[in-house]
């Protein structure tokens, strides 16, 4: 686990402080460009870790940085994203905060990204790295969007049905989208199972938690596929 040191050293005098007005966000810009960029760096990272068998450790460290350090420190994410902070300063930040806790291969990649103005895409790299890691291990990643958080029962049902459908171990990546009119949207690779119409839940009634996922998967021929 990455223990985040104090950020006091980032505090500069008024004249030295960059004029940064953007709002930090844990999620990297969700566009095709960011996704492709994330995959490019993720492939390079995993290739570099295969030789010494450090993939598990590197992915774990990358998850810790994204889910602990960046998520809970908007100021740090702003620093990574801002074009007004030069690459050398970002590299110093990486060294001071993570150099003693994270794998050297990951630190090297982060510095390369900083020098190329790409450090703000670190979360996209993490997402792609985890997906590639799961794929190599024979796991399938299913992105599940629901109008409300899933119950344990529904989570288990979705996992079971998807595992049966694809013949592989499934890991869910869950998100809540309050704009969905009930139901859920499941994406596995290029395949999308969409049942986000409230009337479906009304028909299912109290059996929704136990049977919704099964009906969704079994009737997948009615749902759309997108690339």
From Swiss-Prot:
Keywords: ATP synthesis, Cell inner membrane, Cell membrane, CF(1), Hydrogen ion transport, Ion transport, Membrane, Transport
Localization: Cell inner membrane
Record flagged with keyword Ion transport: yes
Membrane topology according to the record: Peripheral membrane protein
Record-linked Pfam families: OSCP
GO terms assigned for molecular function: proton-transporting ATP synthase activity, rotational mechanism
Any one cellular-component term (Gene Ontology): proton-transporting ATP synthase complex
GO term, biological process aspect, one: proton motive force-driven ATP synthesis
Claim: Membrane is one of the keywords in the record: yes
Family annotation (InterPro entries): ATP_synth_OSCP/delta_N_sf, ATPase_OSCP/d_CS, ATPase_OSCP/dsu
Family (UniProt): Belongs to the ATPase delta chain family.
Description of how the protein assembles with itself and partners: F-type ATPases have 2 components, F(1) - the catalytic core - and F(0) - the membrane proton channel. F(1) has five subunits: alpha(3), beta(3), gamma(1), delta(1), epsilon(1). F(0) has three main subunits: a(1), b(2) and c(10-14). The alpha and beta chains form an alternating ring which encloses part of the gamma chain. F(1) is attached to F(0) by a central stalk formed by the gamma and epsilon chains, while a peripheral stalk is formed by the delta and b chains.
Protein name: ATP synthase subunit delta
Organism: Rhodopirellula baltica (strain DSM 10527 / NCIMB 13988 / SH1)
Lineage per the UniProt record: Bacteria, Pseudomonadati, Planctomycetota, Planctomycetia, Pirellulales
């Amino acid at each position: 686990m990455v223990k985040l040191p104090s950020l006091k050293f980032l505090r500069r005098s008024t004249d030295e402080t960059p004029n940064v007005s953007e709002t930090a966000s844990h999620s990297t810009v969700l566009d095709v460009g960011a996704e492709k960029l994330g995959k490019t760096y993720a492939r390079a990272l995993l290739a570099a870790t295969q030789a010494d068998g450090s993939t598990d450790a590197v992915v774990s460290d990358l998850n810790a940085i994204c889910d602990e350090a960046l998520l809970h420190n908007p100021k740090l994410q702003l620093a990574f994203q801002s074009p007004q902070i030069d690459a050398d300063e970002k590299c110093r930040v990486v060294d001071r905060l993570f150099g003693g806790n994270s794998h050297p291969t990951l630190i090297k990649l982060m510095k390369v990204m900083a020098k190329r103005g790409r450090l703000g895409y670190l979360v996209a790299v993490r997402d792609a790295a985890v997906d590639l890691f799961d794929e190599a291990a024979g796991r399938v990643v299913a992105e599940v969007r629901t109008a409300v958080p899933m119950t344990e029962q529904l989570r288990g049902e979705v996992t079971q049905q998807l595992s049966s459908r694809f013949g592989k171990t499934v890991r869910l990546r869950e998100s809540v989208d309050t704009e969905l009119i009930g139901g859920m949207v499941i994406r596995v690779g290029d395949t999308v199972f969409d049942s986000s119409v409230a009337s479906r839940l009304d028909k299912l009634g109290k059996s929704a938690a136990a049977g919704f996922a099964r009906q969704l998967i079994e009737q997948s021929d009615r749902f759309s596929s997108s690339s």
